[in-house]
Amino acid sequence: MISNYDITDSKSSSKVLRPPGGGSSDIFGSDMPQTPRNVKNRMVSNIFSVEKDNSVKNTVRQGAHRFYFIGDNPRRGQKPVDSHSRLFGEPMRPITPGKNHMKSSIPFGQNTETAAAAQKLLTNGSSTANTTNGHQYNGKSGSVSSASSSVSSSTENLKMNSGSRSVYIRNMSNNEKSKQTKTDTAGCPLTPVASAAAPPPADVLGIDLPCLDLEVGDVPKDNEIYTETGKHDVNIQTRRDSGSNVEQPHSLEKMRSTANLKEPLALCPDYVKEVHGPCNARNPITGLGLNGDGVGGLKPVKQKIREGNPVTGEGYRAGGTDYIKAAGSTNSGSVGNGDNGGNSVVNKNRVPPGGYSSGLW
């Protein structure tokens, strides 16, 4: 505790100051709270330990969770609170018979009469115990009983009395046959009776009605008169009647068809015939073209005679691009003999082969 002494009015006043940050601050070295920490060791086995009573936890619930209804389980760690049992006592639940899982699965029929006959046959005159609604309470008596157990015991009784299930099946089939015969004779006759067809509704079309077999009557007199076609003299008869036949020039096989109106009969008066001139087009890259013949050909190549000596320049002109006649002939560019090129005078005005750096002259 820190005291602050004030000298005003010669009186000492003691004031307790709170540490910065509130009373939870530990600046002034207050003692640690003595609340024990509950550290749970999760590696400890609790197989043989006694369960702790953790029921005093979160007993105050908010909203609709405060109320428990029948069959609701409380949350984990709380006491089971049943509002119905707390207010009205233990509820009266109906007692249901126990389920016998060892009962027989033999079907005994669907209707009650057949089931009663099967039950009477299986019991073989033995009386059932006086139970509520034909069943005994589970756990109320010493013997285990239910509807299925009584059927099982009756089956055992049938075996003990040297009974046979074939007798039961035969009796069941006889009962079914007699019942079916009675039903047929009473309600439905053995021979079917033709029922009158219901009239069709007014909005049904004629095409929707079922087809009826109509009997063909007598042939009219007009249909009996006919003319035989193709009946003529044997001498002039051919394999087929055609337009060349004299007696029957117009046959059914060679009838004149209708004119095709889409095809014009003659040229239109404003029709101008296009004149196609010769195509002189040629591919400038490959040299292929039509040349007007429509077949195609090669580009004519100008033949060049290169008979001059590229070293001495014999046979070439001064330009170096034109060709001359034969090697050894005189021209303005070079002079030489017809013998060889060794005695010829080289015209050094032209560019030597390989350029001036070749060192030829």
UniProtKB/Swiss-Prot annotation:
It is found in: Nucleus; Cytoplasm; Cytoplasm, Cytoskeleton; Cytoplasm, Cytoskeleton, Spindle. GO terms for molecular function: microtubule binding; structural constituent of cytoskeleton. The keyword Magnesium does not apply. Residues 73-87 have a biased composition (Basic and acidic residues). Residues 1-38, 70-99, 125-165, 328-361 are annotated as: Disordered. It comes from the Eukaryota. The modification Phosphothreonine is found at residues 35, 96. Keywords: Cytoplasm, Cytoskeleton, Microtubule, Nucleus, Phosphoprotein. Residues 125-134, 141-154 have a biased composition (Low complexity). Pfam families: JUPITER. Residues 1-15, 155-165 have a biased composition (Polar residues). Transmembrane segments: none annotated. The modification Phosphoserine is found at residues 24, 105, 143, 154. One of its GO terms (biological process) is positive regulation of microtubule polymerization. GO terms for cellular component: cytosol; microtubule; microtubule associated complex; nucleus; spindle. Belongs to the MAP Jupiter family. Binds to all microtubule populations. PANTHER family: GEO05313P1 (PTHR34930), MICROTUBULE-ASSOCIATED PROTEIN JUPITER (PTHR34930:SF2). This is Microtubule-associated protein Jupiter. It comes from Drosophila persimilis (Fruit fly).
